[in-house]
Curated annotation (Swiss-Prot):
The keyword Cytoplasm does not apply. GO terms for cellular component: chloroplast; chloroplast nucleoid; chloroplast stroma; DNA repair complex; mitochondrion. This is Single-stranded DNA-binding protein WHY3, chloroplastic. SUPFAM superfamilies: ssDNA-binding transcriptional regulator domain. The lineage of its organism: Eukaryota, Viridiplantae, Streptophyta, Embryophyta, Tracheophyta. It is found in: Plastid, Chloroplast; Nucleus. A motif (Nuclear localization signal) lies at residues 171-185. The gene is WHY3. Disruption phenotype: No visible phenotype under normal growth conditions.
Length: 268
């Protein structure tokens, strides 16, 4: 269960423009015409004392300044052509398989051109029962979404601690509330060799009552915890905020928001 997306490398071109100004009468006469690249003009003779002047102007610095501080047109093109990546981590055992995939947070564009977080990201857990030796029936998979707070509970578990999460997808949504119950339990194995994940699903709408159990070794659980800690700032959108910080904008942004509580606290 892996997908690989790639995009062809993009080439970036920069041009150097050379502007030659011929102003010496020794080289040009009043009847001469200079033609280059579709440009034609009449040359007016100057005094014999005038010297030949060559002016060279490079646009490379302009290009790199735009790349450094952001060019609106190039950023829009980058948004259109930037590749997307789909990742997940899977654990396969004899009775079931578990795949965990991160889901990105959602932002809304403001009139000012900035973006505001509207929904935090989460981790999607997919449990599939075994259908044979090294075969799993993903058509019967059960899913469970971990919020950032629930992820925090997992990463803070002690060696002998356990946790339990209860979800009702239809809670607060009318008559279907309580008809679907999902319970995820994470408990240490009796011999201390790891933990087990047990997902129980009761769906009265589809007449489903199923439980999927998968043991996780210490090493596998350590990989999960490391990945969870890494992805948390991205799920709450703080990584996007950190990447948008520019030193030259910090004073301007803080001064433009005097109602921000931090300004009042540290300005005392």
């Amino acid at each position: 269960m892996s997908q690989l997306l790639s995009s062809p490398p993009m080439a970036v071109f920069s041009k150097t423009f050379i502007n030659h100004k011929f102003s010496d009468a020794r080289f040009l006469s009043s009847h001469s015409i200079l033609t280059s690249g579709g440009f034609a003009g009449k040359i007016i003779p100057l005094k014999p004392t005038a010297r030949l002047k060559l002016t060279v102007k490079s646009r490379q610095s302009d290009y790199f300044e735009k790349q450094r501080f952001g060019d609106s047109s190039s950023s829009q093109n980058a948004e259109v052509s930037s590749p997307r990546f789909y990742v997940g981590h899977s654990i396969y055992k004899g009775k079931a398989a578990l795949t965990i995939e991160p889901r990105a947070p959602e932002f809304v564009a403001l009139e000012s051109g900035a973006f505001k977080l509207t929904k935090e990201g989460f981790l999607l857990l997919q449990f599939a029962p075994a259908a044979g030796v090294r075969q799993y029936d993903w058509s019967r998979k059960q899913v469970f979404s971990l919020s950032v707070t629930e992820i925090g509970n997992l990463v803070s578990l002690g060696p002998r601690e356990s946790c339990e999460f209860f979800h009702d997808p239809f809670k607060g949504k009318g008559s279907d509330e309580g008809k679907v119950r999902k319970v995820l339990k994470v408990e240490p194995l009796p011999d201390g060799s790891g933990r087990f994940f047990n997902l129980s699903v009761q769906n009265k709408l589809l007449n489903v009552d199923e439980s999927v159990y998968i043991p996780i070794t210490k090493a596998e659980f350590a990989v999960l915890i490391s990945a969870f800690n890494f992805v948390l700032p991205h799920l709450i959108g703080w990584s996007a905020f950190a990447n948008s910080i520019k030193p030259e904008d910090s004073n301007r942004l803080n001064n433009a928001s005097p109602k921000y509580g931090g300004d009042y606290e540290w300005s005392r």
